[in-house]
Amino acid sequence: ALVMTQTPSPVSAAVGGTVTISCQASQSVYSNNLSWFQQKPGQPPKLLIYKASTLASGVPSRFKGSGSGTQFTLPISGVECDDAATYYCQGTNTGNNIVFGTGTEVVVK
């Protein structure tokens, strides 16, 4: 079964700095179908990145996805207070099963 393991929480980030969240898949993600989501308390997840590196509509270019196969990263540059949230990667295996990562909380200081 596909397992997505992320950078352990919490991760501390300074305003204006850069933070990178990693996501490791236990097997190759099918066709690079890897997405990143941002979730804040009481809100539904917001899609940031799909197909590993494609920015979703309306998402600032400070968010950049990269990687392929089993290793993926989400660097956030120019960190803002509003970036404080929990971030999830989501992968798809060859059976089209969708699997979420463990989640990484980003704390902005």
Curated annotation (Swiss-Prot):
Which parts of the sequence are annotated with region: Framework-1?
Answer: 1-23
The UniProt annotation puts the region (Complementarity-determining-1) at: 24-35
The Gene Ontology CC terms held by the record are: immunoglobulin complex
One GO biological process term: adaptive immune response
Query: Region Complementarity-determining-3: start and end of each range?
Result: 90-99
Does RNA-binding count among this protein's keywords? Answer: no
Q: Where is this region: Complementarity-determining-2?
A: 51-57
A matching Pfam family: V-set
Return the annotated region ranges for Framework-3: 58-89
The protein's UniProt keywords, in alphabetical order, are: Adaptive immunity, Immunity, Immunoglobulin
Q: Per the record, which residues fall in region Framework-4?
A: 100-109
Q: Determine if Chaperone is one of this entry's keywords.
A: no
Q: Any stretches that span the bilayer, and where are they?
A: none
Identify the stretch(es) annotated as Framework-2.
Answer: 36-50
Supply any other comment.
Answer: This chain was obtained from antibody to the polysaccharide of a streptococcal group a variant and was isolated from the serum of a single rabbit.
UniProt name for this protein? Ig kappa chain V region K16-167
Name the species this protein comes from: Oryctolagus cuniculus
